Amino acid sequence: MFAIIGIVVVFGAIVGGYLMEKGNLHVLLQPAELIIIAGAAAGTVLISNPPHILKKMAQGLAGVFGGTKFPRQRYLDSLKLLFDLFSRSRREGLSAIEADVEDPTKSKTFTAFPAIMKDHHVLNFICDTLRTATSGAVEPFDIDQMMELDMEVHHQEAAQPVAALSTVADSLPGLGIVAAVLGVVITMGALGGPPEEIGHKVAAALVGTFLGILLCYGLLGPIASNMAKSADEENAYYHVLRVAMNAFIKGTAPILAVEIGRRAVPGPVRPGFQELERLCRKKGPEAAAA
């Protein structure tokens, strides 16, 4: 939502200021210049990126306008899920949660949290870690290294579409100059004609440079920055899961393990101690509805 507001503010301020100076909007409407810039930019994306990165880029663009994936409630649900798993494991032994982590779709503990069930990356991260812990043959330090490696790979993958979009954004001013140069070539061919016609062609050429710079610094650049921050938010979320699971695997009590996880939650969405404690005292499905 804020991204949409920001785009409206950017274009509103530019167009508004232009009109205040008695500018003619019709001069800025140059479809040919836009086709040159947008088409060349799309081509560079296709040249430089494999299909799976293009897919992630599209998903990232949709995420910019769809809001955060990790609000306060997502952290509460995740910590409650971990607490339920930790508590049952502490009471009945690690083997008690083996069936849950082997097939979470049949686990009442997991299915009580639909948002987590929809995120297969998070589901695999939790289940793979706890499945390794239930084997009993791996040291806590080694499990923590596995989680760190998993997070590193996932974060690198999340950074790829951001880098791709940033590269496109950086190329737009240059592509705008390409469009402007082509406009100048056309203008040179019209020399000797009416001054009004020459002036119109010069204006059209300058619009190419204008569009390239505007789309770079006013649209795609900020969108790429937003996607990068979303990737950082996701990494912070995985860090919360990691420290909570690592604490429990080392032998920490369930409530203290999720408290360690809570301390790792970023400040703007961090739940309070008492809020998390009350939630953990509730039963699984009841807590999920709270």
Regions inferred by a protein language model and the residue ranges of each:
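Divalent-cation
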Residues: 2, 6
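Helix-termination/interfacial motifs at the ends of transmembrane alpha-helices
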Residues: 8, 12-25, 143-146, 150-229
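Large intracellular
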Residues: 20-161, 233-290
